[in-house]
């Protein structure tokens, strides 16, 4: 690909809903050798009925990961930070953190969204290109303004979670394009904040910070942090700070038109476009035009993902039954009957006290075995993927031949094969560390002249194995389609 005088060492901070990790990537001019140097679990903390993120725990863990990366590599050329979307923290006028950030799984967003008329919801979509969702920052902010007026009143700056972490490391306040688009306060047509939406919901636009471009240097690591960790200062680079955008940057596609599923806590199902699709069809099908790498658009839908399976596993552990993920898959495969079908995006599954009980309730089968619950969950997820894929084809007018599944969930071969069987499309799984690879790829743009998106994807193909899954010709296509129609008509 390119000749380098020496390898480039990039550190990717990849923060998900259940863990955060520090990944060291060493690019030799052709491929990136990646190593997870530290991974730490984290969860929300419930206080007085609200769920918070322990952002200081995350920050401290990332510092320790940076130290470990330096010890292993000997030098660090740059850092990039990406996390989940929609959540944020407040700073006062002096730049001090006012409170731990609230989690999107709180009910305050739902209460605000439900108060809007159909006309208002369509107006917000037309202004931003983003679907109305209870988790969006817009509705969280509106809820906080009513629930916590004192906190909202003294907040001078609002930073999205990845930009807040970048601020901790550099002291620079900014907003990145892809994460800004998840707020539903950003106009993806003009690539600017949606001033009309700020005015309509009485949210001060001055709380939001200027935008930076991908590959741009945000600032240098604070000298005080470098001294504490006993490492040299290095630049922090503006990467797509929404983890989905980083993952899509690392989709190993060679074709221009492709489908992707970024599979993790959520399943983000979509395609990459050059311009947004803000139409009646997109609105009715509940798609979002989110910001992607280098000002592309990811037309996608947030759908339930591994969170459901993680909660099932947690419920089993609380009942004294511990299973590995391989054992979870075998339990699903052992079920010989017809799986029950349910909508994985049902509100009842958003944050239930017990996921297994909630699924049994949706299936109207209180005595369903754990094997049936798991088989039904996997099948319902795959049918949801099929439905979303068909909707993407309808709104874009394109017929896609392949689906690329990236992220941690791409390692689930059982679900990958189900997806191929139930959609009738070729599936390619991997890379598992797509978010980190995309993060590192965009960092390389700041180091290598002319390095772009096609180079990032070539680097990914050179770096990680990609596994193909083809529709099983032995499966009864007619039965698959009949069950799918039943599933579709019951939604």
Model-found features: residue ranges?
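N-terminal glycine/serine-rich phosphate-binding loop of ATP-dependent small-molecule kinases
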Residues: 1-99, 126, 226-236, 423-425
